[in-house]
């Protein structure tokens, strides 16, 4: 699909549903979380509307169009012949669709508004409450609103209620005069993502006619121009990643449980920040960020000030404003044509004003690749790459500016590849090339983190990217079809540099050495052996011979040179002079068996598959084919292996067996995503 293939880029959906006659008199709406793109919607032949963007939610009142005595039909036309980004975006209905039934008097789709405030000692919270209620009935109605807060054990914390208002037919009313007080609140933070449930009830004639539950977090976010970011008074450095929204095997149609899995893999290496590059997020992903304690910069798709563009910005903010994970709204990314001009400054100023109007509790930001003008009039400046932005010069010239790294370079390379294989679309990580010149756009992951770690006034940074993603395969070309910028590959298997970040972003002891020792064809060649670790010192042994003990520099790495010969490499990490960790890699035999690790979130199981030799060692260069079989109600949704040039089919097609499939290992790893798994997933070589 896409602009090169217009004949295959238009798709139609048709779905029937039935309504019970007893529901006649209720109110019905249909909500689409996201359709890529240019989606036109009909119900029973009546046109509802058009949304051009593939990232904006659509909500339609269908009450006057539905039948109770015969089937109803929803028809959707999707046209993906034009892109919105320069990366893989998928096509079609890829997010949830909701049929919403309510009473005629009900809360509007984005009608709940919650803001939390804390006193100086963080011992008392005030929760400012708001609800927009609409009367979609035929008669004038009096109604009131009650709010009840529950803790995460389901216990009632407090209740408040607003006085009654009268609503004419089609009229709306705001119930926003109330405030709750919570003593000794359990605060939301990255380390303690505690969520309360706010229940909002609409009452008419002493009867509850609508109920909405909203997950909320009580927290206070502060930004300081000199000291950085504070959450509930505690200094927090952003350990962030930028992310697109696709995954091996399923593309952009990521199930909710897989969204959680992706965040879990990032948290394992210490990630606490997520930038939704470059579009509003799937609601399920923001829910996952709330529950896992991830700080979010949510990004608008289009930078502009016409009615439609500001409407997109407003839609994102109104939909997502109650999420405690969101700390800032980004108005755009790398607008090369205007970011260095006064025109860009003026547009950013207007959009920033709109952000502050729609949500006075959070700052605006924008990501610039080189032009300083566009960041002048937003609340927080976002710099894409220290190699492209004179960050320190801007600091000297504008000392009151709050700033962070909205994008920073990773090593860029293929998992498990240590010698370039360009014809086959795979490359060794750029992270390991000699130190580059200051004006080079290529930056080592290590140099980037040192820069941000050493400057308290910078909030932190978001690396490009957390996961590999489809498209934008540069600097490679076909057969490479995936980017290789990820810290984790397309499945979430860690590349070596993931352990660099884990060393400095977590308190967990880390010792990781590479490359693997299955370097067939490179016998007799000198090899650089690296260690990522947060130990004080590391000693390296190659085939039993010590190459010396070295002191680990802060936020750095260690390296030794050795001539490659099959055998064994061992590293010993020391803390306070005592042996703490030992890591061993050795030349292995062929893959003889498989190890599986299953992660279950809701109805989704992600099964990671690893190749082992007869001795139980991980075979880091295995590319064998694996047969997969599931049973019962389980279905295979997709498979992957992290190979950026893999051209095989990734999921069963319509009409094919969804319980048997094959996948090739890539450098020892593969993955299968299963729905409704209640049995063991069988895998075999």
PLM-predicted stretches and their roles:
Residues 3-115, 136-137, 152-153, 280-283, ...:
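Accessory beta-strand-rich segments of carbohydrate-active enzymes
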Residues 48-49, 157-170, 545-553, 637-661:
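Solvent-exposed serine/threonine-rich low-complexity stretches and specific carbohydrate-binding patches
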Residues 62-64, 177-188, 559-564, 655-678:
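Short, hydrophobic beta-strand segments
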Residues 129-133, 148, 201, 527-533, ...:
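Beta-strand-rich structural segments
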Residues 140-146, 159, 190-197, 534-536, ...:
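Short flexible loop/turn segments that cap and initiate beta-strands
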């Amino acid at each position: 699909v896409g602009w090169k293939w217009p004949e295959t880029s238009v798709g139609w959906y048709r779905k029937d549903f039935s309504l019970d006659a007893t529901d006649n008199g209720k109110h019905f709406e249909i909500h689409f979380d996201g359709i890529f793109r240019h989606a036109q919607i009909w119900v029973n032949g009546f046109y509802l509307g058009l949304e051009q963007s593939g990232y904006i939610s659509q909500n339609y009142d269908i009450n006057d169009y539905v039948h109770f005595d015969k089937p109803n039909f929803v028809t959707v036309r999707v046209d993906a012949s034009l892109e919105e980004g320069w990366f893989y975006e998928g096509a079609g209905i890829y997010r949830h669709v909701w049929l919403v039934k309510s009473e005629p008097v009900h809360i509007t789709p984005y009608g709940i508004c919650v803001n939390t405030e804390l006193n100086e000692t963080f011992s008392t919270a005030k929760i400012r409450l708001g609800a927009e209620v609409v009367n979609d009935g035929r008669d004038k109605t009096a109604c009131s609103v009650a709010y009840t807060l529950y803790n995460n054990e389901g216990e009632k914390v407090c209740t408040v209620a607003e006085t009654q208002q009268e609503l004419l037919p089609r009229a709306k009313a705001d119930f926003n005069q109330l405030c709750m007080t919570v003593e000794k609140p359990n605060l939301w933070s990255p380390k303690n993502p505690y969520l309360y449930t706010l229940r909002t009830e609409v009452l008419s004639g002493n009867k509850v006619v609508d109920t909405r539950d909203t997950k909320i977090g009580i927290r206070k976010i502060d930004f300081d121009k000199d000291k950085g970011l504070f959450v509930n008074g505690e200094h927090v450095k952003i350990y962030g990643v930028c992310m697109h929204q696709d995954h091996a095997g399923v593309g952009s149609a990521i199930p909710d449980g897989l969204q959680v899995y992706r965040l879990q893999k990032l948290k394992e290496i210490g990630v606490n920040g997520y930038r939704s590059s470059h579009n509003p997020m799937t609601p399920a992903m923001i829910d996952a960020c709330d529950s896992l304690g991830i700080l979010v910069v949510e990004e608008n798709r289009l930078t502009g000030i016409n009615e439609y563009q500001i409407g997109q910005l407003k839609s994102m903010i109104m939909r997502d404003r109650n999420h405690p994970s969101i700390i800032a709204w980004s108005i755009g990314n790398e607008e090369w044509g205007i970011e260095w001009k006064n025109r860009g400054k003026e547009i950013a100023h207007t959009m920033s004003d709109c952000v502050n109007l729609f949500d006075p509790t959070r700052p605006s930001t924008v990501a610039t690749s080189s032009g300083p003008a566009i960041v002048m009039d937003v609340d927080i400046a976002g710099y894409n790459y220290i190699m492209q932005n004179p960050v320190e010069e801007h600091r000297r010239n504008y000392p009151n500016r709050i700033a962070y790294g909205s994008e920073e370079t990773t090593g860029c390379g293929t998992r498990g590849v240590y010698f370039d294989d360009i014809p086959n679309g795979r490359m060794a990580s750029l992270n390991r090339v000699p130190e580059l010149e200051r004006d080079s756009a290529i930056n080592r992951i290590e140099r980037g983190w040192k820069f941000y770690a050493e400057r308290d006034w910078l909030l932190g940074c978001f690396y490009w990217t957390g996961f590999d993603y489809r498209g934008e395969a540069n600097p490679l070309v076909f057969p490479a079809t995936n980017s290789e910028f990820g810290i984790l590959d397309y499945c979430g298997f860690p590349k070596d540099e993931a352990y660099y970040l884990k060393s400095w972003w977590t308190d967990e002891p880390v010792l990781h050495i590479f490359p693997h020792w299955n370097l067939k064809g490179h016998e007799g060649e000198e090899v650089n052996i690296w260690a990522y670790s947060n130990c004080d010192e590391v000693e390296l042994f190659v085939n039993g011979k010590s190459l010396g003990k070295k002191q680990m520099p802060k936020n750095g790495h260690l390296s030794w040179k050795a001539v490659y010969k099959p055998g064994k490499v061992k590293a010993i990490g020391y803390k306070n002079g005592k042996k703490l960790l030992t890591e061993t890699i050795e030349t292995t035999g062929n893959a003889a068996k498989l190890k599986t690790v299953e992660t279950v979130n809701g109805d989704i199981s992600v099964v990671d598959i690893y190749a082992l030799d007869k001795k139980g060692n991980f075979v880091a260069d295995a590319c064998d084919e694996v047969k997969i079989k599931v049973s019962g109600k389980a279905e295979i949704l997709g498979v992957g292996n992290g190979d950026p040039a893999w051209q095989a089919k990734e999921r069963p097609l319509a009409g094919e067996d969804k319980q048997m499939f094959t996948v090739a290992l890539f450098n020892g790893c593969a993955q299968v995503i299963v729905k409704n798994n209640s049995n063991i997933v069988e895998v075999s070589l």
